[in-house]
Every structure is written in structure tokens, then in C-alpha cells.
Amino acid sequence: MQDLKQQLESLIDGDVSDSQEELERASHDASLFEIVPEVVVAPKSAEDVAKLVEFVAKHKSEHPNLSLTARSAGTCMSGGAVNESIIVDMNKYLTDIGEVEGDEITTQPGAFYRDFEPKTLKHGKLMPSYPASREICTVGGMVNNNSGGEKSLEYGKTEDFVRELEVVFADGNTYTVKPLNKQELDAKMAQGDFEGNLYKELYELIEANYDAIKSAKPNVSKDSTGYHLWNVWDRETEVFDLTKLIAGAQGTLGFVTNIRFGLVPSATHKGTLVVFLRDLDDLGQIINDVLKHKPATFEGFDNYTLMLSFKLFFFFRKTLGWWGMMKLGLQLLPDAFKLMRGIPKMVLLIEFDGETQEEVSERVHNMREALRPYGHEALFEENETEAKSRKFWIMRRQSFQILRKKVKDKHTAPFIDDLVVPPEHLPEFLPEVREIINKYELLATIAGHMGDGNFHIIPLMEIEKQSERDKLEPAMKEVNELVLSYGGSLSGEHNDGLIRGPWIKQMYGADMFGIFKEVKHIFDADNIFNPHKKTDATWEYAKEHIRQEF
């Protein structure tokens, strides 16, 4: 579109840029992909966002490629924050964080979680669905991807903490989205305007396919694929909650401009048991036994992650500073000596919390005693305070950043990075997925949320080579088929984006995929919001935009 920059500059109060530096920055996120936009816009207000949506809707028929994609920190691993038209940078100005009021707090989507959390902790509260990228992600990305993390085992995902949203829909107006009872829903559907018709059409779609939609819900503890229609309308409670659909829609149904989160009390005391597993033979039973003790968090990472953490030890200086890094090194010495006697196949982190340190210590000790019969006790380290286990938490939380920033000859290729399998199947599943990794000669680390069976497998590849890129599709197909054969999900946290959007139909089947397409049409008939994700994603398009240079 000619003069796009000038038209947008005259329209909004925010910034509009088409500088080479800004376009390059916005052309990629943390995924495999690179798409150069026409312009990058930084709105200064929700009114600016509404004007942008209205502008694109008005000119879409004349300029079919015109569209909008929201972006904040650019940490999306699925390619959800890239677009060849207009990138809307929410992270520059829309960063206001309100005050805690009871068990809730309101914030704009561009706020970093690292700035958001201290405000809640001052009141003894926490929004617990933060991902491992908590230091670099924004709350808007958490909502749009329906993020989860180490505390999701106990508390659930971001969709469980969204109380209310301000959303700009395709007509360019801003609407409040929150749970409605049946009387409120009926009144909404009777309005006869854009909003009323949206609610009416969505309600009728869900009602007409109620049983099919409910049965389509993935049988796993966490999921970020498709559209979560099964959580929107419940006949028994007669609650219609559109926030459950917007959370995880990856910006394909509208633009979130304000969020009201629910909060939980933050833990007073924590303690972690670190387990070094010599082998994975009894992993399934160990997981079942651990879950009986109801830990707050149950994480794990493999021997490749552990070895890389030692090899790239100086990376931690950026996170911890020189003194912190040296302290970490001293703490790691005993473990380094243990590793000389044999690298564990997996490191488990089992965290408990409680009202007193005595309660936590007892729970950690009981967990250790329950696992002692498995014969791994020589490699146990019991941690009765969080500080002692901090070194392992750093390895777990920083694992992707270590790979992304510090392995020079290869690049992170997150394409099988977020699969979920019911935990009872992990002893069979993990060796099988490692066979596929080895078959395609991929160097890959495995880390994840053991209690949810949610694993982040991150291959390191020379992705600029055609021979390496040719591995992506067949390897992904094999892993996807394996995951689905165990009743799993293709994404627990990172969402669909460019990388998994093409496989939604494979996961849900043609009928449910057709219902998803109807949802997209109800909200965004002209496809102005974040194209090539979810229902209009194709592998052909994704493949054309794999990043060539890093």
C-alpha cells in the first residue's frame, strides 16, 4: 500500500516507522521465522489501536494484504508475532501496571512480567502462570499464547487467571469481555449490533456442536492449540466466558488492550528436592509417586541441558553478575564431582511450598523417603531452602536462552518444542522421541514440566543449510504422529503460530477444524488479525519464511 507510513502517522498519536533497523528488529521473534513488515507502529493508547483496526478494516478490500499483528517482547517461539504488513508494538507505550485490589490487578499488555510481579509480591500475591521466559516476556504475550510454566501443575494456565479483557474487535470498537450469566448473555445477543451478533453467532455455533466441542478438548493437563471453545459456554453453570476464547487465540480474533488478572497468595516458604536419575526405566512410576505428594512444581531437564550448562557456564554472568556467577560455580563443584562418576539421564526438580519452613522440610524429606526404593538415593540432593537449589532452577529457566545465545555454530530450531503427553506414557514416549531425534541427526536438549508431561525439545541446527531445513517437515510429522498416538497435544504453552498452525487439522480432525474456521469468520471475516496463524496457516507459507541468517 503506497504512503502507508504517512497515512498511519496522520491517524494516530503513536510512532510509525519503516526504518531498516526497526523493520529488521520486528521481522523475527524467538521462532525459526523471519518476515519483514511494511511498517512498525507503536500505539500510545487503546484509542490508537482502535483507529488502526478501523483503518485496516476500511481499506482491506482494496488492499487484501493489509493486516495487523500484535507484538510485545518478541519472545514467541511459534512465529506468532511476525507479519508482512503492520506490526503493532505494544511494548513501547502500553505498559501501565495498576495497583493490586484484593485478589486482582489491571495491566496493559505491553508490560514486562518482570515489572509486573514485584507489584503483586509486595501484597503477598502472585500471578502464577509465568513461563520460563519470565524475565523477558510481557503479560500480553502470556494472554495471547495462553502461557504456562513451572507453577501450572498446581495453579493452571493464564486462561485460568484472566478475569476481564478490553478487546478491539474487527469493527474498530473496544469492548469489555468478561464472564456473563445466561440473562446477561441473552441481553447481549439481543443488541442487534456488531457485538451482539458476534455473541449470538458464537453461542449458536457452540450450541449446535456442543457435544462435539466438549469431546474435542485435549485429554492433557495443559494445551495452547486451536480455539478453546469447550471452555466458553457451560450448560450446567450457564456461564458464557469469552475470555477463555481470547486467551490463547494468538491475536487472531481481536486486539487485547487491557487485562484484569486474578491473583493467588504467594508461597511463604519453599523447598526443593533435586534428583539425578541414572536411567529413565522407572520414570513413569516415579512421576506417579511424586504427583501423589502434590508438589507445587515438578520440573526436569536432560543430560544434554546439564552438560551445556557446565560447558557454557560463563553465560550466567549476564543473569547473575560476576559475584553471583562465582557463587554459583562454588555451589556447582560438588555436583561436578558427582557428574565425573556418571552423567545422569535426567535431573528432576520437585518443589514444595507451605506456611512454615518446618512443614516444607517435612514434605521434602517425605518425598525423598518415598523415592528411596528406586535406588537413585546416592544422587539425591535434599534442599530445604530455595537458595540451595537455585543453581538448578537457573539451568532449567535459562536453558533456551543458553542455546539461543551461546551455541555459535548452530541455531535453535524450535519446531517440536512444546509437546504434551500424559505423564504415564513418558517411559515409552521419551525413548521413542529420542530415536526420531537421532534418526535425523539432530542435537537436541529436552527440558520441561514433568508433572504435566509437557516437554520442550529444542534441536540445534545449521538452519541456513538446505539439507538441514529439509529435515524439519518429516521430523515434525513423525513427532506429531507419535505425540497424538499417545493422546497428547502438539502445544502445551507456546501456541500454534506459523510452526504448528498447519497441523491443527491433523490434531483435531476435519470437523472440529471446520468449527475453528467458523469462529475465525465470526470474529474476523476479512482476516485482518494476524494472518497465517491458526486456521489459515499452511506449511508452504511457513517454509518460505524460515530464517536464513542469524
Task: Give, region by region, the residue ranges found by the protein language model.
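Mobile "lid/hinge" segments at catalytic clefts and subdomain interfaces of large enzymes
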Residues: V139-K311, I343-L349, F516, F523-F529
